[in-house]
Design a protein with these regions (language model features):
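N-terminal low-structure segments adjacent to metalloprotease catalytic domains
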Residues: 1-17
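Active-site scaffold of zinc-dependent metalloenzymes
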Residues: 59-90, 100-104
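Predominantly extracellular/secreted Zn2+-dependent metalloproteases
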Residues: 2, 51-64
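Post-HEXXH active-site segment of zinc metalloproteases
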Residues: 87, 91, 103-138
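Acidic/histidine-rich, surface-exposed loop or edge segments in extracytoplasmic proteins
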Residues: 13-28
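Zn2+-dependent metallopeptidase catalytic core
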Residues: 29-54
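Long, well-structured alpha-helical subdomains associated
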Residues: 127-163
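Histidine-centered divalent metal-coordination motifs
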Residues: 95, 99
């Protein structure tokens, strides 16, 4: 188990592996939001895989995410975290799956804390939102997340998937 999955997290689905923070089970609102996210992940993942090159064995974690972050993807351990409080989780899921694809296709790589984009070393991100947002992998993820979400939802609707 990755250190991004906590010992108190509960495995609620084996395929795909979805863990939920234990805090969710003590709050009805969070529980209801997590249930919707789980359903969407389970039903949408096969559609994402038709559009993106994704690694096998992505582990999902639903729980609190610190700071102003809505989600994250850790390339080496293939853990995708989503903030369980999100309303627009499909957009964040698309954003993080774009990162998963970037790592899987080696477009984005990290070696000893140094980021490489398409094989070229990229300087450290700055401390502002703009410097973070202007990193090439973030530009691609932000620019593509809405279109990817639309394509996946359209594919699900045309396949009569209830979500």
């Amino acid at each position: 188990m990755s250190h991004y999955i906590k010992g108190s997290d509960k495995l609620v689905c084996k395929s795909p592996a979805i863990y939920v923070s234990s805090q969710v089970f003590y709050n009805k609102d969070l529980y209801d939001k997590a249930a919707k996210q789980i359903k969407f992940i389970k039903k949408s993942l096969k559609f994402y895989k038709t559009i993106l090159s994704l690694p096998k064995g992505i582990t999902f974690r639903l729980g609190s995410v610190k700071g102003s972050v809505n989600g994250y993807y850790v390339g080496k351990s293939k853990v995708l975290g989503l903030d369980v409080k999100l309303v627009d989780y499909s957009l964040v899921l698309s954003h993080e799956l774009i990162h998963a694809s970037q790592f899987y296709t080696k477009k984005l790589n990290v070696k000893q804390g140094t980021f490489y984009w398409n094989g070229s070393k990229v300087g450290r991100k700055g401390t502002t939102f703009n410097s973070y947002r202007n990193q090439p992998w973030e530009v691609e993820a932000y620019d593509g997340q809405a279109d990817l979400t639309r394509k996946v939802i359209e594919a699900m609707m045309s396949s009569n998937v209830d979500f």
